Curated annotation (Swiss-Prot):
It comes from the Bacteria. This is Hydroxyethylthiazole kinase. One of its GO terms (molecular function) is ATP binding. Catalyzes the phosphorylation of the hydroxyl group of 4-methyl-5-beta-hydroxyethylthiazole (THZ). The keyword Metal-binding applies. It comes from Campylobacter lari (strain RM2100 / D67 / ATCC BAA-1060). ATP binds at K114, S161. The gene is thiM. Belongs to the Thz kinase family. Gene3D superfamilies: 3.40.1190.20. CDD domains: THZ_kinase. Substrate binds at M38, G188. Disulfide bonds: none annotated.
Length: 260
């Protein structure tokens, strides 16, 4: 139902993302059925906000020029009440990076935050103790309580990626048990997750459901790719193949999650 809708609608997903994984994000978006636009030129942001279904922001290789484009774009998408996904990469690592991410979080209508547990901990007011882009934080009951409080206070969905993924709203939490350890052996897996959230949010009004379906789809594609891969190189290629061949029946049959 959801993937079929994506392939029928072909939503335009505007990315302002990092230059390490921009190609992965574009190919993953195309594979699942969307049309990515990778545009960070500040003078274009208003025009793209009018034609695109969703905005995905990733601060992995942030600099002042790109940050200003993100602010401009987030302003226009927010004014149009269109979904905005933020991946605050390495939040908590440096003061300059934190300042940019916190401005995005505090000044604009971010719909979905996709990050690892350390980054989300920094978002919700816990000490994330981030180490680069690696996750060093364990999700526990206190973390989940604080995350739900944040989601309620800011009307946002939190997507916590890890060995177990969490989708957190003000009212409910989903735990996803699908996935592959191979996703940690390549660059871009987390960035592609944010892209998937953007794709699904571009066609699904309920952002909790959009985030849940996005992460299930990506995690299941990772499982399918691992089954036929010999290492990280073939896994990367097979992941794009798996996303392009994935359908709603695959997700229904293989989904392993619970709502708590």
């Amino acid at each position: 139902m959801y993937i079929e809708k994506i392939r029928k609608v072909k939503p335009l997903i505007h990315h302002i993302t990092n230059y390490v994984t921009v190609n992965d994000c574009a190919n993953a978006s195309i594979a699942i059925g969307a049309s990515p636009i990778m545009a960070d030129f500040i003078q274009e942001q208003e025009e793209f906000s009018k034609i695109c279904n969703c905005l995905v922001l990733n601060t992995g290789t942030i600099n002042e020029r790109v940050a200003n484009s993100m602010y401009e774009s987030a302003k226009f998408y927010g004014n149009l009440n269109k979904a905005i996904v933020l991946d605050p990469v390495a939040l908590g690592v440096s003061m300059a990076r934190d300042a940019i991410n916190l401005k995005l979080l505090n000044s604009y209508k971010i719909s979905i935050i996709k990050a690892n547990a350390s980054e989300i901990a920094s978002v919700i007011g816990l000490d994330g103790k981030a180490k680069g882009t690696d996750n060093t934080f364990v999700v526990n009951d206190h973390f989940l309580d604080k995350a739900c409080e944040y989601a309620k206070g800011h009307n946002r969905i939190l997507v916590v990626s890890g060995e177990v993924d969490f989708i957190i709203s003000s009212e409910k939490i989903a735990k996803i048990y699908n996935g592959s350890i191979m996703a940690t052996k390549i660059t871009g897996a987390g960035c592609m997750c944010a892209s998937m959230c953007g794709v699904f949010a571009g066609v699904i009004e309920d952002k909790f459901q959009a985030s849940l379906q996005a992460m299930l789809s990506f995690d299941i594609a990772c499982e399918m790719a691992e089954e036929i891969s010999n290492g990280s190189g073939s896994f990367r290629v097979n992941l794009i193949d798996a996303l392009s061949n994935l359908n709603d029946e695959d997700v229904k049959k293989r989904a392993k999650y619970e709502i708590i």
